[in-house]
UniProtKB/Swiss-Prot annotation:
Cofactor note: Binds 1 zinc ion.
Database matches in PROSITE patterns: UPF0054 (PS01306)
Record protein name field: Endoribonuclease YbeY
Gene name of this polypeptide: ybeY
GO terms classed as biological process: rRNA processing
Binding site for Zn(2+): 112, 116, 122
Localization of this protein: Cytoplasm
Origin organism lineage: Bacteria, Pseudomonadati, Pseudomonadota, Gammaproteobacteria, Pseudomonadales
Function text: Single strand-specific metallo-endoribonuclease involved in late-stage 70S ribosome quality control and in maturation of the 3' terminus of the 16S rRNA.
UniProt cross-references to SUPFAM superfamilies, sorted A to Z: Metalloproteases ('zincins'), catalytic domain
Amino acid sequence: MPLELDLQVASAAPDLPSEAQFRAWCELALRQRPESELTIRLVDEAEGLELNSTYRHKDYATNVLSFLADVPDELLDIPLLGDLVICAPVVAREALEQRKPLQAHWAHLVIHGCLHLLGYDHIDDAEAEEMETLERELLAELGHPDPYACDDEEPPSKEK
């Protein structure tokens, strides 16, 4: 069974990636678990703020939130992985501020969120290095630049 992707566009925004692009990015990030079911929900800043406040106790809309399906496999008939919530206006603003190609930033955040669902994290430096290295490798396969490279004096802001 291939990847089952439920794409929910709760907030329309200009220049959103296609469902095929979201699927390709997820399949790339989830190669080690190709039989997965996940939802990607695209939200506005109000919903992004509400979710980030409720689940992370942060008072701002963040770029991507990941929610792992915490259900024992034996209780499911499907390989449910979890949900990603991506705030489209934040993605667009970050790409502009960080002078990154918009589609490359979308790809990065989808891959980043999928890796969280697989158990990767960036809480400590060693975990962050492992996760960021994998992100760089996967994005390079797509022909996208290193998302952590910085052309100016100020490093790009990185939201967790």
